[in-house]
Amino acid sequence: LRAIQEQVAGLPWVATARVSRQWPDTLDVTVTEEEPAARWGADGLLNAQGRLFIRHTTHIPAELPRLAGPEGSEAEVAARYVAIHEKLVERGLGIAALELDGRGAWTMLLSNGIGVRLGSQDVDIRLARFFEALDSVVAPVAVDVQVVDMRYTNGFSVGWKQQRSARSTTDEDLPALTRSREA
């Protein structure tokens, strides 16, 4: 029975399997299917625990966020995704993609198309600064923002879309907080 249970549990879409004998000549097999929570790389699937359960598939639900990172980093990237996602949902946003590169640098793409560069050092501090900037500075001009670079020690930079809206951003668009820093 154990060998059968291990074989069934080893199938790609099987999260858990239980095999028991029903006397006299019946096997009872109970299977729980994996539920994909995110894409991994180009064609893999992660479950909610951050476990890569399919390495290559042709059918990937389009609504799943795309996570990526070095081999073996699936759980770390998934945990970071969950932590960031919770804070973004409060603001009506989500994560379209989150990546950890081979040097340990984090980048993400928000559901509204804004890219965010977090780098590899002090990521939690940079994320806190990003959420503060998102609420107070970026949100009012989000339609014109292409990327926010948080890799600076005491600030951040904004990369604007090439095709800016008809009106340009003025000092009046920015909150008093940023103007007071210039004084």
Region roles according to the model:
Residues 3-10, 16-183:
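Charged, solvent-exposed interaction patches on well-folded alpha/beta domains
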